[in-house]
């Protein structure tokens, strides 16, 4: 008996939460791509102060991420957390225009702290909570999470081009567009009726779904060289790249005759990149299964180094747009490669913990310091000289990671050797 024939086409939860992804990432795209431009051109912050704002966002993210993770697990399929995030997103425009902006102009630290708390909660930490919730719904409602997640790429891409046009007319329109989209988010939550899977309910009652994880096993992770080498890659490559990308929009628009023209071009380039991102995201598992997770991470590192170093030598708008498009290759290879690496090298029962601590937490923690450092360097020596330093560092860590990251074959060989040693005793 086939129970999954009409899994997606006739599954209301697939379409409801696919649209939820679309709208949520649409709203997120009213913030992040244009935030550095808004901070510099509208608020008048220098690059050092912009770096402080991004550092506060990272600090808030690492504070909220584990808390929201625990709350999300306890709530299960209850929509309480999604309602809180959606209501806060409805206040997106009022907060930015009437709280965040005045505070930034009055006191950079108060403004950065308030913006960091808000953006860190609804976006940096909230996105993980939403993704975890919808992934749970997908398992209970029998649809593929990855296919629903692709709606998010389309939402981000659509908003990037629309927002780029509106930003040139009146930046406040972009924020009000985000608040309006939040109303549709709340409407989706009203009609969404995720139901627990009956089999899962029985298994939970029997205790069969309880993870066999202890605090000792978690702490033992940090005694493993493999864990620290993975964290080295995450901080030295992925984190540095994120810091580079934070203020890239400000650098990008300097290649155009007017800031408005540059903002519009950045929006269109982001849209094209997100469409390519969605296509490559769909194909990336097929590629990664053939080349292996370690090689995928190394390729991602080379792509990131190429974009950063290339940006330091860019002299025309065409060159900087082409370099921007490399982001569409990097994102799928890094995200899918990281998950494949974690599940292939470490105990799969600890995969969520490793991803939270070794990837998200490590990256956000390092970004607190690197964002402020990069912002200061932009002011002191300029974008391109700083990019050359960052790019060479990323390239160096990628080369080192070729020798320090583990492959599945190396893990299997080590396990086999350990088994033979045990038998010989």
Curated annotation (Swiss-Prot):
Give the organism's phylogenetic lineage: Bacteria, Pseudomonadati, Pseudomonadota, Gammaproteobacteria, Enterobacterales
User: What InterPro entries does the entry give?
Assistant: LacY/RafB_perm_fam, LacY/RafB_perm_fam_CS, MFS_dom, MFS_trans_sf
Stretches in topological domain Periplasmic? 35-50, 102-107, 171, 249-267, 319-325, 375-385
Cleavable signal peptide? none
The cellular location(s) given in this protein's UniProt record come to: Cell inner membrane
Q: Which organism is it from?
A: Enterobacter cloacae subsp. cloacae (strain ATCC 13047 / DSM 30054 / NBRC 13535 / NCTC 10005 / WDCM 00083 / NCDC 279-56)
Q: What is this protein called?
A: Melibiose permease
Residues on the membrane's Cytoplasmic side span: 1-13, 72-80, 129-149, 193-227, 289-297, 347-353, 407-425
UniProt similarity note: Belongs to the major facilitator superfamily. Oligosaccharide:H(+) symporter (OHS) (TC 2.A.1.5) family.
Q: Does the keyword Cell membrane apply?
A: yes
- GO cellular component labels: plasma membrane
The UniProt keywords, alphabetically, are: Cell inner membrane, Cell membrane, Membrane, Sugar transport, Transmembrane, Transmembrane helix, Transport
**Role noted for this protein:** Responsible for transport of melibiose into the cell, with the concomitant import of a proton (symport system). Can also transport lactose, and has weak activity with maltose. Cannot transport the analog methyl-1-thio-beta,D-galactopyranoside (TMG).
Pfam families membership:
LacY_symp (PF01306)
Q: Which gene underlies this protein? A: melY
For membrane topology, the record states: Multi-pass membrane protein
């Amino acid at each position: 008996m086939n129970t999954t024939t009409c899994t997606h086409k006739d599954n209301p939860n697939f379409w409801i939460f696919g649209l939820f992804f679309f709208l949520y990432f649409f709203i997120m795209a009213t913030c992040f791509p244009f935030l550095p431009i808004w901070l510099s051109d509208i608020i008048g912050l220098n690059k050092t102060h912009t770096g402080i704002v991004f550092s506060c966002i990272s600090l808030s993210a690492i504070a909220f991420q584990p808390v929201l993770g625990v709350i999300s697990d306890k709530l299960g399929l209850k929509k309480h957390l999604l309602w809180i995030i959606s209501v806060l997103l409805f206040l997106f425009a009022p907060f930015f225009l009437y709280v965040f902006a005045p505070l930034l102009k009055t006191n950079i630290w108060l403004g950065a702290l308030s913006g960091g708390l808000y953006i860190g909660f609804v976006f940096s930490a909230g996105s993980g909570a939403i993704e975890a919730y919808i992934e749970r719904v997908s398992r209970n409602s029998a649809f593929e999470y990855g296919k629903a997640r692709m709606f998010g790429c389309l939402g981000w891409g659509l908003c990037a081009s629309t927002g780029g046009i509106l930003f040139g007319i009146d930046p406040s329109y972009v924020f009000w567009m985000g608040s309006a989209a939040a109303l549709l988010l709340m409407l989706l939550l009203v009609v969404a009726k995720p139901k627990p899977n009956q089999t899962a309910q029985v298994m939970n009652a029997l205790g069969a779904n309880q993870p066999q994880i202890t605090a000792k096993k978690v702490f033992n992770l940090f005694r493993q060289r493999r864990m620290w080498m993975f964290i080295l890659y995450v901080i030295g490559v992925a984190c540095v790249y994120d810091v580079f990308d934070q203020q890239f929009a400000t650098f990008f628009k300097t290649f155009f005759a007017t800031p408005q023209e540059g903002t519009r071009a950045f929006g269109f380039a982001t849209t094209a990149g997100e469409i390519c991102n969605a296509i490559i995201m769909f194909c990336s598992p097929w590629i990664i299964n053939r080349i292996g997770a370690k090689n995928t991470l190394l390729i991602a590192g080379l792509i990131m180094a190429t974009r950063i170093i290339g940006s330091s030598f860019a002299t025309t708008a065409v060159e900087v747009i082409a370099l921007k498009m490399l982001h569409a290759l990097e994102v799928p290879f890094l995200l899918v490669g990281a998950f494949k690496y974690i599940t292939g090298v470490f105990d799969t029962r600890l995969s969520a913990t490793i991803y939270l601590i070794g990837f998200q937490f490590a990256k956000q923690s390092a970004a607190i310091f690197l964002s402020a450092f990069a912002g200061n360097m932009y002011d002191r020596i300029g974008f391109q000289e700083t990019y050359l330093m960052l790019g060479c560092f990323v390239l160096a860590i990628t080369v080192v990671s070729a020798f320090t990251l583990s492959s599945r074959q190396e893990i299997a060989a080590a396990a086999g050797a350990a088994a033979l040693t045990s038998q010989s005793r």
